[in-house]
Amino acid sequence: MSTATLAAAVSSVRIVARQMPDNSASVVPLVTHCSNCHLRDLCLPCGMAGGDVDRLDSLKFGRRKVLAGQTLYREGDGFQFIYAVRSGTFKSSLMLADGREQVSGFYMAGELMGLDGVAHGAHASSTTALEDAEICTIPYAHFASVAASNSGMQHVVSRLMSREIVREHSLMVLLGSMNAEERLAAFLLNLSQRLKARGYSASEFHLRMSRAEIGSYLGMTLETVSRTFSAFQQQRLLEVDKRHIRITDLDGLTRAFETRVH
């Protein structure tokens, strides 16, 4: 596997009868505009010129609290909004024919959700909060109409679509060509990088997702996930206390992953 493919895999590993999403949580006017939001360098305005960010501020965004376990939208629901995570963690998933849930991604502050609905006007997955969270709701039709006459915002739309393609490609690489230790190492390194970008510790964090959800995302059984965590502890790469993770040798975890891949 090439170094470029490895880098993409680590940086992008970012997951019944249908019902309408639970919209009981209120949507309130957005108090913090994109131009002065502390997440602007990670979220929608990233790379935008000042004038384009001002245009974003003119759009009618809403803010909404989402409780742990609450589903934001379900697979098959009509597409209206894209969502920016302000705080908390979400998982995206889809239902397999045999009734099992397949986790397809995890999202944290500054990341966008709901783009899977752009192509066909309906969401291809469900998204659920893993902890109490807050989001910005962005009416896609309004956003797209403003972007249609603005080259800077058109570039943003293209970047967002490209990011989704890269994420899907990286997941295929992860599932198709890596063993269990490589998959879990890539997952932990990715979380570490994303948390560091948000000002948190790169070496010590609490997993918001269960081991079963990690296994579903990585294509591993719960037992294999547990065994692999134990193997990393024995190699003194990690300390694990339930969902609390401390990477004791970040360079070693990275080197071990790169050595296995090559």
Question: At which residue positions do the language-model features occur?
Answer:
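Cyclic nucleotide-binding regulatory module and flanking cytosolic helices
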Residues: T3-A68, L112, G117-H120
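Cyclic nucleotide-binding regulatory domains
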Residues: R55, Q70-D132
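Short aromatic/basic micro-patch
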Residues: R63, F106, T137, R208, ...
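Alpha-helix/helix-capping structural signal
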Residues: S87, A141-H142, A212, D251
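Cyclic-nucleotide recognition modules
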Residues: V103-V166, S170
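Polybasic "coupling" helices that flank or enter modular domains
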Residues: A148-T221
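Phosphate-/nucleic-acid-contacting segments
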Residues: Q193-H262
